[in-house]
């Protein structure tokens, strides 16, 4: 019989989240819930939410990087909603991806 003193921590591992397995910051479970709730399809593959979470994370990182560049040009310290709104205008691909987004509550001139 093995004593519990020799076996500390052996059976206490916690489940690894899908976001952790894919090394993502965005929650795969929340993306999956949104896809199911939106009824975009009858059935959903296991890797579809993981892929979409990775795409969203990449897009957000790209926009924040461009917003940081806009912020450095205008010389404030904090990234503001205006900087995030103006950032995609410098890149054609990101502009096309974000062109249909509604900036709710943001009222500023370009």
From Swiss-Prot:
GO terms for cellular component: nucleosome; nucleus. Keywords: Chromosome, DNA-binding, Nucleosome core, Nucleus. The keyword Nucleus applies. Signal peptide: none annotated. GO terms for molecular function: DNA binding; protein heterodimerization activity; structural constituent of chromatin. It is found in: Nucleus; Chromosome. Core component of nucleosome. Nucleosomes wrap and compact DNA into chromatin, limiting DNA accessibility to the cellular machineries which require DNA as a template. Histones thereby play a central role in transcription regulation, DNA repair, DNA replication and chromosomal stability. DNA accessibility is regulated via a complex set of post-translational modifications of histones, also called histone code, and nucleosome remodeling. This is Histone H2A.1. It comes from Lilium longiflorum.
